From Swiss-Prot:
Subunit structure comment from the entry: Forms a heterotetramer with UvrB during the search for lesions.
Zn finger spans (C4-type): 252-279, 738-764
Domain ABC transporter intervals: 309-587, 607-936
Protein name per the record: UvrABC system protein A
Organism classification: Bacteria, Bacillati, Bacillota, Bacilli, Bacillales
An example molecular function term from Gene Ontology annotations: excinuclease ABC activity
Gene, per the UniProt record: uvrA
Length: 956
């Protein structure tokens, strides 16, 4: 066996055509090719699956049932495999308790740091809470010079009302002769006047001492007596100086605020020992959002100002509201904004104890009379959300609720006692709010004692290393408190990459899926050097990637193709990037060598004269941003990672447009207003989420082509004779489907500690339909055979059916001619799902008032796919007059835009400002723009190439 190579023979997973390939070990290997060509099938479904399977096979049968075991890949032979670790984009944690800090384990080290060198500080008095032994107290007193006069006291009453006669009697019985009351010293036998209704402090004077040699024992005994009498507290009054307050407990001597023994679990918001009891460590509470309940205060109650109580099905709440308003004298025709504060308070929060007469008449004419207090809209929604057993009702009420910072912990997730522990005047919650860059600066500037430095040194080493790795993969703008579920696929992948670098494993096979996603060109170099450093310590890296810089940095490049789907699955070229660039059969090689490229448009559109204007956007890190987007253009929002692109487009603009145009309830990010919405009719967000969550959804059903296909089969003579309607040809309802597998075509068999096995249905043999339905044929094929066709085959087959052909043509136009009409939605990649959505939009008639938003549409796309995607996006603008707004880092997309909005200058707090706007040429001239810096050479290079191509074409 060759130890220098991973040898694969006869790989046939998905569309792979029985391929043989050798991959050098301990190298940075990049796999590329068109979307759907078989890269992931080779990298993840063959190499990783076999590496993982072999590891799991080595475990006991008992252990295997707890681990998700991979299916054995369809391959003849794989040799030279190391233990495999997959770092893809699909395994991001959606758990609200998972944060950047917990995923990278930085939070675990911070917990240890605070448990070992943290100082509890009383939140009420701002003094450090310490626990001291008697020896430490004696040593502290003896630091004062000789002849210093002191008196030792036991504070037995602290800030309590009463005459305290019983307490004074007990002191007398103990044999003490002096006490101090409210700062005045009295003989115990004196008549002491103490006012009953005022707060008082009483200390027993235990001893009076002058500091000199040989008083250690007496001092020790006196302090010990004070501690015994005052439950662990002692006061040493230094005559002519301040008083010293000592405590045996972790408690404030003034107010008694106490902190238990410091231990790491106390600083975990996932542990009951540290989590805030109000929000259970989530940092947020689900509260009713008034602005969602009443989005438009210019409406009156009769005009339906209160969305959740609009009379749709039940008249109960509208009738209750009318009765309450009548009782409390509230005019239901007055706009809500003109009601008095008291009237609005009754509507929103209820009438408390005031009752009103309510007569409810239901749809059947039955009436019910009662006197009840008015509950109020907000408490009503909250109660129905908390108490209902119906998922439907809970989902309905959830639309009007939002996560607000917890009032107890202010969003820090931890108990008050935990947040009282400080290191350099910062509690652990504040450090978690730092960005990676700020955290690095904080730890570099920490001031600790010699002993603390010694304890914290190994912790600092680990924390700094992990922060450094996050910075190196371009994530220095993230905060450690950022919820893992809010990260993009690329960010989550690079976090796991940083965690793996921190482990410093060697001899491992890492398989990565497009780590450059969401990364600005500026940060790409750092990512590449990180990958190279992982290789240099003795690991093999297989990276599925389309980024040109990453491909050129590879030791070995494998191009899979030549096409996608059925047209792919072969090794087209393999070798160094330079060798692949010279290969005439490789599309990737053509793009690397410059033979093929995406041209620069000859002119930029100005739009139709109308524009959308965002005013005062402040969501997340946006700094009161104003932005204009010309309508009927292809516009692009750019900027370094974390600069605020998603905040501006997705949080503010998309949610505001969806709320206005689509009646969506999602609350937009903070902004003043958006002008020009009246020029639009609909907003379409085309993201990379699946087109369906079950295998029953497929490209034919999503684009609507399947409806027309079922109509066609139902219109055949045989179907009419048998009385079959359109529903007969659906695999989702009884009638035409196979009932043995309920139209799935496969049956799942659970194998417990082995992977679940899916076998074709024995009755329909995977065809989904019963025999009678399959008897119906159109042009020689039944419905099951039609679903097995590729889109290209379907287009030819239905060429005489314009309704179907038009829909299938758009799927071919977006470069998905290779997918099958009935291919389950769950097997489509994110990029493929996004293009199916685009295709379904292309065949719709438009009036130029649609607004499309795409967030990084080039994810998973080869340069050739990007060229096709751009043609489709330009078509939406050119032919339909619609507006397309894209968030993108890919320079091929950016250079094709009509208008750019560049955010920055940095990520996180250093971003959130508009750096430059205008055409790509204008941005390229900007000295402040990082995007412009990288765009300029690409524009110049490709303009030159475009001019050369035009000149060559003219000569011919």
């Amino acid at each position: 066996m060759d130890k220098e190579k991973i040898v694969i023979q006869g790989a046939r997973a998905h569309n792979l055509k029985n391929i043989d390939v050798e991959i050098p070990r301990d190298k940075l290997v990049v796999m590329t090719g068109l979307s759907g060509s078989g890269k992931s099938s080779l990298a993840f479904d063959t190499i990783y699956a076999e590496g993982q399977r072999r590891y799991v096979e080595s475990l006991s049968a008992y252990a295997r049932q707890f681990l998700g075991q991979m299916d054995k890949p369809d391959v003849d032979l794989i040799e030279g495999l190391s233990p495999a670790i997959s770092i893809d984009q699909k395994t991001t944690s959606r758990n609200p308790r998972s944060t950047v800090g917990t995923v990278t384990e930085i939070h675990d080290y911070l917990r240890l740091l605070y448990a070992r060198v943290g100082h509890p500080v009383c939140p009420n008095h701002g003094i450090e809470i310490t626990s001291q032994t008697i020896e430490q107290m004696v040593d502290r007193v003896l630091e004062y010079p000789e002849k210093t006069r002191i008196q030792i006291m036991a504070p037995i009453v602290s800030g309590k009302k009463g005459t305290h006669k019983k307490t004074i009697e007990e002191i007398k019985k103990e044999g003490y002769v002096r006490i101090r009351v409210d700062g005045e010293i009295y003989d115990i036998n004196d008549e002491i006047e103490i006012e009953k209704n005022k707060k008082h402090s009483i200390e027993i004077i235990i001893d009076r001492i002058v500091i000199k040699e040989g008083i250690n024992t007496r001092l020790y005994d006196s302090i010990e007596a004070a501690l015994r009498l005052a439950d662990g507290y002692a006061v040493v009054d230094i005559m002519g100086d301040k008083e010293l307050l000592f405590s045996e407990h972790y408690a404030c001597p003034y107010c008694g605020f106490s902190v238990g023994e410091l231990e790491p679990r106390m600083f975990s918001f996932n542990s009951p020992f540290g989590a805030c009891p109000t929000c259970d460590g989530l940092g947020t509470k689900l509260e009713v959002d008034v602005d969602t309940v009443i989005p438009d205060r210019s409406l009156s109650l009769n005009e339906g100002a209160i969305i959740p109580w609009r009379p749709i099905s039940s008249q109960y709440y509208p009738q209750m509201l009318a009765s309450a308003c009548k009782e409390f004298g509230i005019d239901m025709d007055t706009p809500l904004e003109k009601l008095t504060k008291e009237e609005l308070d009754i509507i929103l929060n209820g009438s408390k104890d005031k009752e009103f007469y309510f007569e409810y008449k239901n749809d059947f004419g039955m009436t019910r009379e009662t006197w009840i207090p008015f509950e109020g809209i907000l408490p009503n929604i909250e109660r129905r959300y908390r108490e209902t057993n119906s998922d439907f009702t809970r989902d309905q009420m959830a639309q009007y609720m939002t996560d607000l910072p917890c009032p107890s912990c202010k969003g820090y997730r931890l108990k008050e006692e935990t947040l009282s522990v400080k290191v350099n005047n910062h509690h652990i919650g504040q450090i978690s709010e730092f960005s990676i860059n700020e955290a690095l600066d904080f730890f570099d500037g920490l001031e600790l004692s010699e002993k603390e430095t010694q304890i914290a040194a190994p912790i600092f080493k680990e924390v700094r290393a992990r922060l450094g790795f996050l910075k190196n993969v371009g994530l220095d703008y993230l905060t450690m408190s950022r919820a893992a579920g809010t990260l993009s696929g690329g960010e989550a992948q690079r976090i796991r990459l940083a965690t793996q670098i921190g482990s410093r494993l060697t001899g491992v096979l890492y398989i990565l899926d497009e780590p450059s996603i969401g990364l600005h060109q500026r940060d790409n170099d750092r990512l590449i050097s990180t990958l190279q450093s992982m290789r240099d310590i003795g690991n093999t890296l297989i990276v599925v990637e389309h980024d040109e810089d990453t491909m050129m940095a590879a030791d070995y490049l494998i191009d899979i193709g030549p096409g996608a789907g059925e047209h792919g699955g072969r090794i087209v070229a393999a070798g160094t990037p330079e060798e692949v660039a010279k290969n005439k059969n490789s599309i990737t090689g053509d793009y690397l060598s410059g033979k093929k490229f995406i041209p620069v448009p000859a002119k930029r559109r100005k739009g139709n004269g109308l524009e959308l204007e965002i005013i005062g956007a402040k969501a997340n890190n946006l700094k009161n941003v104003n932005a204009k987007i010309p309508l009927a253009t292809f516009s692009c929002v750019t900027g370094v990672s974390g600069s605020g692109k998603s905040s501006l487009v997705n949080e503010v603009l998309r949610k505001a447009l969806a709320r206005k145009l689509n009646r969506n309830h999602a609350k937009p990010g903070e902004h003043k207003e958006i002008k020009g919405i009246e020029n639009l009719e609909k907003i379409i967000n085309i993201d990379q989420s699946p087109i369906g969550r079950t295998p029953r959804s497929n490209p034919a059903t999503y684009t609507g082509a399947f409806d027309d296909i079922r109509d066609l089969f139902a219109s055949t003579n045989e179907a009419k004779v048998r009385g079959y309607k359109k529903g007969r040809f659906s695999f989702n309802v009884k009638g035409g489907r196979c009932e043995a597998c309920k139209g799935d075509g496969i049956i799942k068999i659970e194998m417990h500690f082995l992977p679940d096995v899916y076998v074709p249905c024995e009755v329909c043999h995977g065809k989904r339909y019963n025999g009678e339905t399959l008897d119906i044929r159109y042009k020689g094929k039944n419905i099951a055979e039609v679903l097995e066709m590729t889109v290209e085959e379907g287009l030819e087959y239905f060429t005489n059916q314009p309704r179907i052909a038009r829909k299938l043509q758009t799927i071919v136009d977006v470069g998905l001619g290779y997918i099958r009409l009935g291919q389950p939605a769950t097997t489509l990649s994110g990029g493929e799902a996004q293009r199916v959505k685009l295709a379904s939009e292309l065949h719709k008639r438009s009036n130029g008032k649609s607004f499309y938003i795409l967030d990084e549409p080039t994810t998973g796309l080869h340069a050739d796919d990007i060229g096709r995607l751009l043609k489709v996006l330009q078509r939406l603008v050119e032919e339909n007059g619609d507006t397309v707004l894209v968030i993108e880092h890919n320079l091929d997309v950016i250079k094709q835009a009509d208008y750019l909005i560049d955010l920055g200058p940095e990520g996180g707090d250093g971003g959130g400002q508009i750096i430059a706007t205008g055409t790509p040429e204008k941005i390229a001239r900007s000295k402040k723009s990082y995007t412009g810096k990288y765009l300029k050479p690409i524009l110049e290079r490709d303009k030159e190439r475009t001019e050369e191509r035009i000149a060559t074409a003219k000569k011919k």
